[in-house]
């Protein structure tokens, strides 16, 4: 007699649902409300920064954590920096203008049709 083994209930933590990433590495995007733009160089499927960072955002503007978050080589009229931005706060930048961040040359090739190509040595 072949009895099927019973599977015990899983004790693994349940991962949050993962939303579809709207943007890709190399895309040029801009913030919906703030005056900056940048190139995506990494994507987190859900929020993966510190709770301290999250709580520093004014409550009325805090994005949901259950969405993709993007790491940007960002710029505004005054400086270049790295930004961490939720998907809901980004839109494609259609200006066709290059982003003038000093780290771009180390990660990406030329700008082509609104996106930067990742250099061969950085592709997985």
What are these regions (language model features)?
Residues 1-28, 34-37, 44-47, 121-124:
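Mixed-charge, Lys/Arg-rich low-complexity intrinsically disordered regions
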Residues 3-6, 63-124:
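Intrinsically disordered, low-complexity, charged/polar segments
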Residues 32, 41, 75:
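Structured beta-strand/turn binding interfaces of compact recognition modules in eukaryotic regulators
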Residues 41-42, 51:
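Short, glycine/acidic-enriched capping/hinge loops at junctions between secondary-structure elements
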Residues 43-44, 98:
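Alpha-helical interaction segments
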Residues 47-56:
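Short, solvent-exposed secondary-structure boundary/capping segments
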Residues 57-63:
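Short proline/glycine-enriched turn/loop segments at secondary-structure junctions
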């Amino acid at each position: 007699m072949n009895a099927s083994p019973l599977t015990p209930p899983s004790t693994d933590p349940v991962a949050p649902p993962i939303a579809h990433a709207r943007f890709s590495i190399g895309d040029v995007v801009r913030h919906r409300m703030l005056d900056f733009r940048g190139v995506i160089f990494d994507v987190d499927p859900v929020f993966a920064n510190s709770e301290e960072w999250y709580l520093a955002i004014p409550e009325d503007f805090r994005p949901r954590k259950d969405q993709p978050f993007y790491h940007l080589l960002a710029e505004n009229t005054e400086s270049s920096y790295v930004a961490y931005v939720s998907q809901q706060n980004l839109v494609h930048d259609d200006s066709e203008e290059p982003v003038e961040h000093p780290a771009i040359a180390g990660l990406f090739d030329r700008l082509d049709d609104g996106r930067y190509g990742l250099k061969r040595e950085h592709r997985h």
